[in-house]
Structures are given as C-alpha cells and as structure tokens.
C-alpha cells in the first residue's frame, strides 16, 4: 500500500492535484509483477514517486519500468527502480502518462514536452493505457485548454511542412524553439517539433481523419493526437477530489 503522504501541503495546488491523480491511478492499476510503460512530463514525476515508495516498502515487487523519454529514464534510475526497454519487454501490461488536454471523447493532445513519438510507441505496446492529469487538462473539445497539436518531423522536412500543413488543414504552424539553446527544440530522436495551431470552433472536426492524413505525409514522424487508445483518465480537482472517468467504448 502506497499513500500520498509527505509534504503535499507545501506543493502548489496544481501540483497537489497532479500528485493525487498519479497516486490514485498507481494504486488502482499498478501491481507487483507489472510491466509498466512510464510516460513523460510534470505529472509523471509523481507517478515515479509513487513507484519508488511502493518498490522501497515492498508493496510493489518485480516491476519493470519502460520509460518514454530520456528524462523519465533518469528519474527512474535516480529512484532505484528497475528500468528496461521495448527490446527486452516488447509487450507491456500498462502504460500511464500525462496529457496536455483530454476531450469528452477521450482524444488527447500530448507532446508539450516533445516526447510524443516515444510516448505513442510505448503506449501501443501496452494492453491498457491510463492518463493522469490535473483539472486544467479536462476539456469538452480539443483546443479549449491547449491550442496546438505538436508534430514531430524530420529536420529535412521542417520548412516544407510549415507551409503544407496549414494549406491542407488550416490554422498556422510554428517551429518550436529551444529555451536554453539557439535554434529549434531537438527531440530524443534527433527530430524537430512543429506546433500546429489549428482553427477553433470548427464543428464536426474528424480528428481521426486528420491524424491519418498527417501520419501519411512524408517527413512527419508522429503527431501528438492520441485517439481511441485511452482506457480511463484520472482527473484531480482543486477541491482535493480525484475522478476516474472510464472509456466505455473500450470496456
């Protein structure tokens, strides 16, 4: 048994929510012997904290953690957790990750941290996929909370895609720039990120069709659209509550 103890009161309210969501999901879906895909981002660091507590106190035994990014791998190693990869464990029991936005149809935008391709690869290797998020990620329609769809692209294709994506899909595109280095963000895979700012208030938008068109475009490695893959979302709210919303279409 792992409980969300410690100096939670010292955390900002939004961080408290992230921690509660991570601990609630871990408590329900991570068991001893689990082969677990571990996502990336600020909410996932609390999942790593949960795993560390369980592993150290013996309530979680023989778990295997497959990270979705270099940073997550470092968190796992620093926490003393067993780390593996898809070469050794190509089939996972569970993947748990955060999201930048989740709409009422369980469609997610991910990739704010630039890890979207590896996140999607690990997610597809898992039998079940659970999202952990604070209340600011809960939306009725994509774009209400997060304005862009991140798209990982080959560097060679970046400039043509900055022009062709808006022509085909509307909106506008920007090449994501780094903060502490000159030039664009470079992903763990050595690629660039284009942020597609899609047009809002478009009724009947078919995200699946958009995903298919983008995925079939030469030079695009992967998009931050996660469609039809979420089994449940754990949203933590400012009043201290955590709500699990189960995707009935997958159960």
UniProtKB/Swiss-Prot annotation:
Catalytic activity: aldehydo-D-ribose 5-phosphate = D-ribulose 5-phosphate
A single GO molecular function term of this UniProt record: ribose-5-phosphate isomerase activity
Gene Ontology BP term (one): pentose-phosphate shunt, non-oxidative branch
Keyword list, A-Z: Isomerase
InterPro entries: NagB/RpiA_transferase-like (IPR037171), Ribose5P_isomerase_type_A (IPR004788)
Keyword Isomerase listed: yes
Any one Gene Ontology cellular component term annotated for this protein: cytoplasm
Protein's UniProt keywords contain Electron transport: no
Top-level division of the source organism's lineage: Eukaryota
Organism: Caenorhabditis elegans
Family that this chain belongs to: Belongs to the ribose 5-phosphate isomerase family.
Involved pathway(s): Carbohydrate degradation; pentose phosphate pathway; D-ribose 5-phosphate from D-ribulose 5-phosphate (non-oxidative stage): step 1/1
Protein's name according to its UniProt entry: Probable-ribose 5-phosphate isomerase
EC nos: 5.3.1.6
